[in-house]
Design a protein with these regions (language model features):
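Receiver (REC) domain active-site loop signature in two-component systems and cognate sites
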Residues: 94
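C-terminal output helix
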Residues: 145-154, 158, 166
């Protein structure tokens, strides 16, 4: 029954509107209230269509972080708006909404624009990296990746964001 309600809600989003709603308005109509398992830990959102990759990255992070998962950019955008995680790890090539579009939308929304986004992808050419950074990505790691590199880079992104927040106060 819950899945049917969600599917009907998603269909409602796709109906034409007289005015263009913001992403936040669309998501507020569809989301139900949930709580994170451990609100004392920093929260990481993993967006990847490959369940094995999501599972592996989650296994690296679960001791230190609360981990939320999404299988495509659209679902990831919804979860980012709902939970406002401390960082996002996102694949580039995914169905529904790719990682570049997801990153661009995250950085355009006031509510999520401050969240560090790490692109974790098989796309490793400099031109592809440039495209990722132009979409607003804060970091770019190519698959296959070194797990220690991912963990250190993620920790640095979160720590740098915390320092900015301390320096500028609650303005960011």
């Amino acid at each position: 029954p819950m899945e049917i309600v969600e599917e009907q809600s998603v269909d409602r989003i796709q109906e034409p509107h007289t005015t263009q709603p913001t992403v936040v308005e669309e998501l507020e109509e569809t989301e139900t209230e949930e709580r994170l398992p451990d609100e004392n830990k920093e929260c990481i959102l993993i967006i990847d269509d490959n369940a094995d990759v999501r599972g592996y990255v989650k296994s690296l992070l679960k001791e230190e972080y609360t981990v939320i998962e999404a299988a495509d950019g659209h679902a990831g955008l919804k979860k980012a708006m709902k939970y406002v995680p401390d960082a996002i790890i996102c694949d580039v090539m995914m169905p529904v909404m790719d990682g570049l579009e997801c990153c661009r939308k995250l950085k355009m929304e006031l509510q999520t624009s401050h969240i560090p986004v790490m692109l974790l992808t098989a796309c490793s050419l400099d031109e592809q990296r440039i495209q990722g950074f132009e979409c607003g990505a804060d970091s770019y790691i190519s698959k296959p990746f070194n797990s220690k590199l991912l963990l250190v880079r993620l920790r640095n992104l979160i720590d740098n964001h915390k320092r900015l927040k301390q320096f500028f106060g609650d303005k960011i």
